[in-house]
Regions:
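Bacterial N-terminal signal peptides
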Residues: 15-26
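Bacterial N-terminal signal peptides that target proteins for export
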Residues: 2-17
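Short, glycine-/small- and polar/acidic-enriched structural segments
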Residues: 32-184, 188-195, 211, 215-217, ...
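Periplasmic-binding protein-like
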Residues: 115-125, 209-235, 247, 286-292, ...
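Secondary-structure end/capping motifs
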Residues: 237-320
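Short, surface-exposed acidic
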Residues: 165-169, 208-212, 274-287, 324-331
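Conserved C-terminal helix/tail region of periplasmic/extracytoplasmic solute-binding proteins
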Residues: 308-349
Length: 349
């Protein structure tokens, strides 16, 4: 019989421990990541870098989230896509959400983090166009993508500026034809977001500063919020901590991206190598300045909303679009999932 030594006992103990460890790993696997599907407002561009930074730096993973981020086809479309269950989360126009919630309150998703706090909606016209104010739209032809946020809000602009909408011809075309349709004179004005049009024009060899002008909705009483993180009622009800974790991860990425915009654009380029990094960096900076830099963020922080301001926006849209009911502020946005106020960015530059 072989003598049992101290070293053999130690080896046996280690082997037993390793075996038990394997059993425990099998019995208690690592916590599964929650898989989420997100749809953007548009194609992969500089301003979408926030989301990809959160993914690349592991912020979503640290919150137990495995994210899939798909390109979008208009700022209004994420709302029905999230409402239908096709996606868990969307980056879309909060005004389209107000419209949806007015008509289908039981299905409507809810906003949890507003990123575009200034209205980007515009009608672009040629620099030499006789159109100077919204009233000049009468008798003209305006065009845009069917799901364009500015087009969806045009009835509200008509109401506020006393335009007779019946005197304005509206035509639809694919988003990639917008600048071409305008510059060739096939339409008198094109709906869109200011920076979307500006930078699409630049990529097409058009100088928007010399060849275009913009009739901006915000200059005519439409002090509206715009794109926000929209989540499904199902996700809010069944996995509120996942929603909170998503917002926390995104907020960290926003802070990082504000410090290093080139990193944000590089994260986009990783997914879409054909982008022009220099143009997308310029687009990123312009989006910060024109669409995300409302003075209120110094007080309430980026991501948050002013309830009184949102209530006024809801009233404007309900009245102008003759919606069937007036949603309450808490139906459209919840503060529940925001990080502590001290953690929200108070300045962008």
């Amino acid at each position: 019989m072989r003598a049992i030594t101290g070293s053999s006992l130690r080896r046996s103990a280690l082997a037993l421990g390793a075996a038990l460890g394997l059993v425990l790993v099998a019995a208690f696997p690592a916590a599964a990541q929650t898989k989420l599907k997100m749809v953007l407002n548009w194609k992969y561009q500089g301003p979408q870098g926030f989301f990809f930074v959160a993914d690349d730096k592991g912020y979503f993973k640290a919150e137990g989230i495995e994210i899939t981020i798909d390109q979008g086809d208009g700022s209004a479309t994420p709302i029905p896509k999230v409402a239908s269950g096709a996606y868990d989360i969307g980056f879309g126009d909060i005004n389209a959400l107000i419209d949806f919630a007015s008509k289908r309150p039981d299905e409507a998703p809810i906003a949890v983090y507003v990123m575009f706090n200034r209205p980007p909606f515009t009608v672009a016209v040629k620099a030499d166009s006789p159109i100077k104010t919204p009233k000049d739209f009468e008798g003209k032809t305006l065009g845009g993508a069917a799901n364009d946020g500015a087009l969806k809000l045009f009835p509200a602009l008509c109401k506020l500026t006393k335009i007779d909408c019946s005197k304005v011809a509206i035509t639809n075309f694919a988003p990639n034809l917008r600048e071409q349709m305008l510059m060739q004179g096939q339409v008198d004005g094109a709906f869109g977001y200011v920076n979307t049009i500006r930078f699409s024009a630049k990529l097409s060899g058009i100088d928007p500063d010399k060849q275009m002008r913009f009739i901006n909705y915000g200059d005519y009483g439409m002090d509206l919020y715009s794109n926000a993180i929209i989540v499904s009622k199902k996700l809010v009800k069944e996995k509120p901590e996942v929603v909170r974790g998503f917002v926390r991860a995104l907020n960290k990425a926003v802070i990082d991206s504000l410090k290093d915009p080139k990193m944000a654009v590089a994260a986009v380029a990783k997914r879409e190598p054909l982008i022009n990094p220099a143009v997308e960096l310029e687009r990123f900076d312009a989006t910060l300045k024109d669409e995300m830099n409302h003075p209120e963020i110094a007080r309430i922080g980026l991501g948050n909303i002013d309830d009184t301001r949102l209530k006024k926006a809801i009233d404007i849209l309900v009245d102008a679009s003759q919606l069937p009911r007036t949603p309450k502020v808490e139906e459209i946005f919840t503060h529940e999932f925001l990080p502590p106020p001290a953690d929200l960015p108070k300045a962008l530059f």
